């Protein structure tokens, strides 16, 4: 009887500890980052920031890439999975090459109007594609019978966060990303102001 009691007691104690440890590992948010070397996992700033926010960091930044690569990965379906699209709370874009990402002359009305794959000749068009495609994919979850956003009026709420470069010498990029953020109503992380 004593052994049975001790076994049951130990079972409940260890189960409680396991559950408590598992609960402490849960996160409130999931944030996906795309970018180049400044954002790559080796730098660690994104992962540290996510830990401070109690968020799961999904870092898809790759050194040497540009926004065209992000657009191409979206077109190929390799930037995020359907499950990740369903569950991420924000898409953070940190493609901070010193290029104009706001120039509107060659932008298309819909992301489907762009020819893929992208090259690096038009950063504004690639940014536009990434933004419009993400917004559309979130909206269209309302028509996906397997989505938790199925039959909702507007699909999944889409949050896109843009970033300046932390070095203020990237004037072309930093100025144009501010315009793009203001135009789209996107949150902007102003690294150049606070670093």
Language-model features, listed with the residues they occupy:
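Alpha-helical scaffolding within the catalytic cores
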Residues: 42-44, 70-86, 129, 133-136, ...
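Conserved SGNH/GDSL esterase-like catalytic core that processes O-acyl groups on lipids
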Residues: 25-33, 38-125
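Boundary at the C-terminal end of the N-terminal hydrophobic targeting segment
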Residues: 18-20
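Serine-dependent acyl-ester chemistry module
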Residues: 98-121, 144-157, 165-175
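Sec-dependent N-terminal signal peptides
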Residues: 4-14
